[in-house]
């Protein structure tokens, strides 16, 4: 290990190094690994109690662990050998702490004293599949869109919020009319299911629709001061202790690789070897669809399909709960996927009486060899070799950055559902499961997905931004990451003709918010040129001082400057005022700043300034009025 405790592993053959990787992961992160395994198995309630029940029900419903057991049999002989070697390394450390009196492996095990079960190859595959689940939000967005439509938000306002055209004549579709006439808020909930979960869905970690972001970019030999390629990646994970990633160096025979691993998964997810470097950015592929399944009123064990009535597949699961009696849950499955019961994802809000909601997800495949895609990158000697196994990636869907000595490229990988051109909702809201043309038709070929390699600009970049302008059903997604980062990063990369490692690091460490540079002048234009009398006397000086500070600000989110704090508080309050008035409790889904939405509102793109008129008042407010109120509230919360 070096001075930062990063392990460097050297083995004679690959299995030796993977054994040592398992040992090092367990040595440093055993609690993290065991906790993640419990989550994938749907067994967190055993140690955390009822508060983890929703997570356990979701994992059991999606069958994460059993699917991973089946996937183990689909791996190549070499991958299974490496998975077993890794598991043996983990278990060697577990045996040491269990049998040799060398402590418990982590302080948390003094609180949760249950015996640590041996690590199995299935465990690693389950963690990979769970990573795919936590990297998508499409089912939750379908539910949110539906609820917003039912709140009478018209197509133009949905376009403002999601920065994508709404469904054509969305308010006239079969699905909308069906939901509008069928949903009865007082009857949608299965009371016995609802009582099972003690926590409100809006307070659940599963309710968050926002995904972590990532940036990948590279310059080719023609844009490098040394004539070598330079690649960079900064995956933005959620804050956690310990961090999601663990840095490791590995070598065996004449091969070597170094980079970021996820404890429990025997692969370098982001890193480099002697010949290539690789990085990842979430591709935001629409990899989930919800279906409304109509229950046969004459037989509750059957549901309607396009070809007639069919029986639900049914299994039961026992979930043990700390300090409580175990519970039994019934899990049903349709041809479209498992039924989301127990208000998973808040689904009861869009589940009509006499119907269920099922989920199709690309991670539900048994033939999932995603882990091989990353392990093969560790051993690749060129872009072409690295690209060869990317079609194996099922979940999580990613834009993969590859760079060798002479080439750079970004390739979209991960399963993309094939949908019919006649799909009635295009996957934007739940579709009717008994209507033909709504079900999936398999998956797109890897060759059909977007990629860029050695462009004339000598630069490749992705910041979770839109990667294709193809129309449905070849569109990949309707929901993408923001577009501000791609603008800023492209500008910085184009600023220099030739880059060095230092200039790339400088871009990675850039703290200028292009969103702030765009939005602040729109937000403050009237106030900067107004008069002190427009503010209540008690806070005139504070408001004007804040405006003075912001007038000298260049958008740099420097933590030592007061300007970013003033701006962030102001813009957040402004967004809350204009959205919460329209959507009520659903505002919890819009707590993250939405720069494109705010720019549309402040510029009144297609009349979007109508958001500034507060429904709860009789007066007709403008965006200048709301901007002023938001500034006052952000400076002195009790003022309004």
Question: Which ranges hold each PLM region?
Answer:
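Structured, non-membrane catalytic/scaffold regions adjacent to prosthetic-group chemistry
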Residues: 74-98, 222, 227, 235-238, ...
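Proteins synthesized as precursors that undergo proteolytic processing into mature forms
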Residues: 54, 63-66, 87-88, 372-397, ...
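Glycine- and acidic
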Residues: 68-77, 230, 366-376, 469-476, ...
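Glycine- and hydrophobic-rich flexible loops that cap the catalytic core of alpha/beta enzyme folds
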Residues: 209-211, 215, 250-263, 267, ...
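Gly/Pro-rich active-site capping loops and adjacent beta-alpha segments
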Residues: 7, 11, 16-65, 279-330, ...
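Substrate-recognition/specificity elements adjacent to catalytic centers across diverse enzyme folds
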Residues: 1-230, 235-238, 259, 573
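Charged, long alpha-helical assembly modules
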Residues: 565-640
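Hydrophobic alpha-helical segments
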Residues: 338-340, 349, 355, 393-496, ...
